[in-house]
């Protein structure tokens, strides 16, 4: 019985994989394959390498902007404090979720 079960499971797995591959690559004129994000990015990169497409460049603005520069030490301290607050909130959430049964 063990061999029949093993054969059935392998057959089921292979059939599922084949069906998924068929629906991905061939069904509806390869809709999912052609519209996959990794394929679009790959086609775009290939077009750039073949010099058929240009790289999109953002235009720089001529208006002045304020830029805030902070030391990395302050940024790390803020990130640390945020993590401590989130951890404390998570720990205290266990106490608020418990209900007392009378």
Curated annotation (Swiss-Prot):
TM region(s), chain numbering: 4-26
InterPro entries: Mic12
Gene Ontology cellular component annotations, sorted alphabetically: MICOS complex; mitochondrial crista junction
Family as reported in the entry's similarity comment: Belongs to the MICOS complex subunit Mic12 family.
GO biological process: cristae formation
Role according to the record: Component of the MICOS complex, a large protein complex of the mitochondrial inner membrane that plays crucial roles in the maintenance of crista junctions, inner membrane architecture, and formation of contact sites to the outer membrane.
Gene this protein is translated from: AIM5
Protein name as it appears in the record: MICOS complex subunit MIC12
Organism field: Lachancea thermotolerans (strain ATCC 56472 / CBS 6340 / NRRL Y-8284)
Cell location: Mitochondrion inner membrane
Keyword Transmembrane recorded: yes
Complex formation: Component of the mitochondrial contact site and cristae organizing system (MICOS) complex.
Taxon lineage: Eukaryota, Fungi, Dikarya, Ascomycota, Saccharomycotina
Keywords: Membrane, Mitochondrion, Mitochondrion inner membrane, Transmembrane, Transmembrane helix
Pfam families to which the protein is assigned, alphabetical: AIM5 (PF17050)
Record membrane topology: Single-pass membrane protein
């Amino acid at each position: 019985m063990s061999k029949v079960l093993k054969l059935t499971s392998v057959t089921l797995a292979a059939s599922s994989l084949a069906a998924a591959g068929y629906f991905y690559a061939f069904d509806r004129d390869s809709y999912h394959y052609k519209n996959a994000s990794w394929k679009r990015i790959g086609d775009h990169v290939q077009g750039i390498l073949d010099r058929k497409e240009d790289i999109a460049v953002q235009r720089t603005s001529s208006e002045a902007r304020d830029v805030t520069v902070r030391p990395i030490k302050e940024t790390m301290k803020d990130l640390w404090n945020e993590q401590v607050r989130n951890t404390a909130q998570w720990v205290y959430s266990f106490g608020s979720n418990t209900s007392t049964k009378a």
